[in-house]
């Protein structure tokens, strides 16, 4: 994971990416790596988000049960309660909360898409792509979120944050270029 200082130099100015927010949206940041959590926390706070950190899936489930969360940024590979188990519980208990999963294992893409994940991003993260993905998911209509979770014809996303229209029309998961 790049440091917050390096990450800041790679992204665009906030005004170019997202409209001004009057209410701070809350992001639950779940990663067992304190360095990753700290770097992402700093970047997201600078962008105007309120960030609630969690060390693992169990802590994330406890926090989302007692807090109002707008989006979850979830590492898949964690000890104790892994990201997949955590995602399944979040999507069952809080289906309107979009989840972005992050992983160092790109082969998990197809499983993530078929599971109804809002987006999957590969480590090391490109901060500008992360910020664009967060903004897009927070602005996404509720019907799209519900359709994705129900496995209906919702746009599929992959690591670059694009939609694969050809696979959508075939009814299969998006494939990277």
Where are the model-predicted features located?
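Active-site residues of response regulator receiver
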Residues: 75
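Alpha4 helix (beta4-alpha4-beta5 surface) of REC/receiver domains from two-component response regulators
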Residues: 85, 105-122, 132
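Hydrophobic/aromatic residues positioned on beta-strands within the core alpha/beta folds
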Residues: 100-102
């Amino acid at each position: 994971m790049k440091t917050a200082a390096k990450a800041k130099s790679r992204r665009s100015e906030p005004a170019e990416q997202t409209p001004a927010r009057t209410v701070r949206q809350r992001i639950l940041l779940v990663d067992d790596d304190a360095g990753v959590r700290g770097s992402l926390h700093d970047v997201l706070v600078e962008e105007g988000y309120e960030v609630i950190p969690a060390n693992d899936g169990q802590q994330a489930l406890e926090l989302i049960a007692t807090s109002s969360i707008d989006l979850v940024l979830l590492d898949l590979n964690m000890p104790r309660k892994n990201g997949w188990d955590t995602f399944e519980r979040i999507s069952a208990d809080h289906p309107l909360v979009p989840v972005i999963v992050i992983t160092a294992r790109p082969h998990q893409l197809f499983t993530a898409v078929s599971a109804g994940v809002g987006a999957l991003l590969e480590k090391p993260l490109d901060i500008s792509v992360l910020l664009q993905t967060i903004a897009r998911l927070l602005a996404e209509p509720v019907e799209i979120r519900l359709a994705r979770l129900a496995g209906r014809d919702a746009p599929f996303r992959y690591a670059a944050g694009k939609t694969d229209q050809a696979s959508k029309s075939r009814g299969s998961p998006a494939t990277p270029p």
